[in-house]
Amino acid sequence: MLFRSDECYSMIGKPEIGYKLEDGVRMAKVLEKEGIDAIDVSCAGYDTYNYWLEPTSFEPGWRKYMAAAVKKEVKIPVLAANLIRSPKQAEEQLEEGIQDFVSLGRTHIADPHWVNKVKAGKEDEIKRCICCLYCMESMQKNAYKGTHAHCSVNPKLGKESEHPIANGNGRTVVIVGAGPAGLMSAEVLAKRGFKPIVLEKNAFPGGQLQLANKPPLKEKINWCIEDLVTNATHYGAEIKYNVIADESIIKSYNPYAVIIATGGKAIKPKSI
């Protein structure tokens, strides 16, 4: 693993502490002569944390030039992550000669079936990592408690041994609200054999994610909305927009169950 520390330190106001890209390339050549089989190119360090474990503001592939610089100077295989978030991006970087192998980290946390979906030509069903870092936050928080990490787009993380019972038998479940909770509920219920019908008062899905995606550099949150809709409908959920889910409308579906997923209520701390 190579760290282009100098650039990363400069970004946090501490220039000239680390070493530069050319130093990393020189180290790669030395390591190759020493007989290593391959090299995995990354950058930064624990005190420049967000330059190797990027938040949502970073563009996919932003550090691929580092892998390319190493690739030009060594003959052994080069691996790199480069914040890869789509099969197309991975293929492009391989074809461009930037690297020989693709490394996927958080990508597999968000969707452990990523590779199988690509092999099966089901790229549109991939749940993309939005780089929110909730996985790292939860790991740090839960490490002392001995519990697992969590993922904003993969609620099954850490619960892989739990298998929902497929006992829907085609029964209808009405879900009020097409936000993340409602859409995820629809997907899970559809997988279990229920017939989920999502009623959304707006003309679009997403719920409060449609607020969270508005600040600058938060565009990846749109991926979350797109992937939730794609997977829910793929498994058989029906989403109806511009519907006010009053009692009469809900009863008209003769549902086996009703889920109210209209979003949480904001609270104002007493201290402010």
Residue ranges of predicted features:
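Short, structured secondary-structure boundary patches
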Residues: 59-63, 103, 216-223, 239-240, ...
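FAD-binding core/adjacent interface of flavoenzyme oxidoreductases
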Residues: 130-140, 166-167, 235-272
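Short alpha-helix boundary/capping motifs
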Residues: 98, 121-122, 217-218, 233, ...
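Surface-exposed alpha-helical segments enriched in charged/polar residues
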Residues: 29, 68, 229-230, 251
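Beta1-alpha1 glycine-rich phosphate/pyrophosphate-binding loop at the start
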Residues: 175-238, 242, 267-271
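Phosphate- and divalent-cation-binding pockets in alpha/beta enzyme and binding domains
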Residues: 89, 208, 249
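Flavin-dependent oxidoreductase catalytic cores
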Residues: 1-176, 180, 184-191, 196, ...
